[in-house]
Amino acid sequence: MAPQSLPSSRMAPLGMLLGLLMAACFTFCLSHQNLKEFALTNPEKSSTKETERKETKAEEELDAEVLEVFHPTHEWQALQPGQAVPAGSHVRLNLQTGEREAKLQYEDKFRNNLKGKRLDINTNTYTSQDLKSALAKFKEGAEMESSKEDKARQAEVKRLFRPIEELKKDFDELNVVIETDMQIMVRLINKFNSSSSSLEEKIAALFDLEYYVHQMDNAQDLLSFGGLQVVINGLNSTEPLVKEYAAFVLGAAFSSNPKVQVEAIEGGALQKLLVILATEQPLTAKKKVLFALCSLLRHFPYAQRQFLKLGGLQVLRTLVQEKGTEVLAVRVVTLLYDLVTEKMFAEEEAELTQEMSPEKLQQYRQVHLLPGLWEQGWCEITAHLLALPEHDAREKVLQTLGVLLTTCRDRYRQDPQLGRTLASLQAEYQVLASLELQDGEDEGYFQELLGSVNSLLKELR
């Protein structure tokens, strides 16, 4: 049986359907091929974009983490993941919780000024050359500032003080003269030596002159223009005040000034001083004269020898035996102690060091002071002065008794009053020394006095 053919009205739709299917299949194949070609020809570009996208995301996450800063306190606090810990913080791992914890260190208690903030240190901001330039400018600025301050200070000094030349010029215009010490002393000597000056003016001139001659150079200048002899001659005045203040000036000029001492001996000062001490004069005048005598004799063996020749020990003996002269007696005893020890030390120094000149050593050896003291009865005089009530006076007398012990030992032993006085002082100073020990003074004043008394008693047994 022959096959049946389809009518033409059905064939047309089938052909259209088949054509659409073929067109769709072709389009799909073409698009798939283009996609593969695109993927194969641009792999690097696609990978770079993906990497940049991931890095950007990581940086954003990192910035977010950095901005979350941990603020430590003095108590332990748990650290969250990603938190920034300020430098200097103390970090530990809590073994119980497994968390990291942080707090401030103890030494940061008073110097945590950053409050946990990060310092933005950008090393690319300044180069080393920039820093050097900035430092140079800073130094220049400091120097300029210092220079400005110096100029301002100098201007202030110039405003307050004027040059000496300008002052002299102004003084010349005002008839005012700036005097040197030498000129002042010449004027004072002329005032004192003028017959037209009153007693008050003469005393005022001597009083002012004493201030200047304390300086060694001024005292020698006084000698150079003849002023020293004028003052020495003032010791002959009939006015006790003139004698007193003239001796006051001489005592200041003689003190530790060998050149002036020599000229004073040659000018007759020693004889005049002894005459005043040997005659009836006010106590104040004799104090000043005795001061001048002590200044003249100390460290001047030639003057000491002349003092002995002129009967100085007799004059002093008479002085201390007068009533109401206890103050002078203590000063005389102190002078004798100084002269005796001075000679002893000078001879010892000459033997040990051999630095003293033979001439001066010979002068000291010619001063026979200890034999003179023994002959003039100073052993007994000094011992009787131990009865003075003042502790300071007793101290000086005890010192003098000690240096005279070798010369006066026999006379001390034969003096019953001295033994009783020493025993009384021993009992008195034992009580006072024990009080010092109770107050915690191991080397007190009264303990030293007690030691001197005990030493004398031991030597005289």
From Swiss-Prot:
A GO CC term attached to the entry: extracellular space
Family the entry assigns: Belongs to the SIL1 family.
Glycosylation sites: N193, N236
Spans annotated as Interaction with HSPA5 and localization to the endoplasmic reticulum: 1-256
Signal sequence, start to end: 1-31
Domain of life, per lineage: Eukaryota
An example molecular function term from Gene Ontology annotations: identical protein binding
Quaternary structure annotation from Swiss-Prot or TrEMBL: Interacts with HSPA5.
Name of the encoding gene: SIL1
Posttranslational mods: N-glycosylated.
Assigned keywords, A-Z: Disease variant, Endoplasmic reticulum, Glycoprotein, Protein transport, Signal, Translocation, Transport, Ubl conjugation
Primary role: Required for protein translocation and folding in the endoplasmic reticulum (ER). Functions as a nucleotide exchange factor for the ER lumenal chaperone HSPA5.
PANTHER family hit by this protein: NUCLEOTIDE EXCHANGE FACTOR SIL1, PROTEIN FOLDING REGULATOR
Any one biological process term the GO annotation gives: intracellular protein transport
Associated disorder: Marinesco-Sjoegren syndrome: Autosomal recessive multisystem disorder which is characterized by cerebellar ataxia due to cerebellar atrophy, with Purkinje and granule cell loss and myopathy featuring marked muscle replacement with fat and connective tissue. Other cardinal features include bilateral cataracts, hypergonadotrophic hypogonadism and mild to severe intellectual disability. Skeletal abnormalities, short stature, dysarthria, strabismus and nystagmus are also frequent findings.
Keyword set includes Cell cycle: no
This protein's name: Nucleotide exchange factor SIL1
Location(s), subcellular: Endoplasmic reticulum lumen
Statement: the UniProt record of this protein carries the keyword Acetylation: no
Tissue specificity note: Highly expressed in tissues which produce large amounts of secreted proteins such as kidney, liver and placenta. Also expressed in colon, heart, lung, ovary, pancreas, peripheral leukocyte, prostate, spleen and thymus. Expressed at low levels throughout the brain.
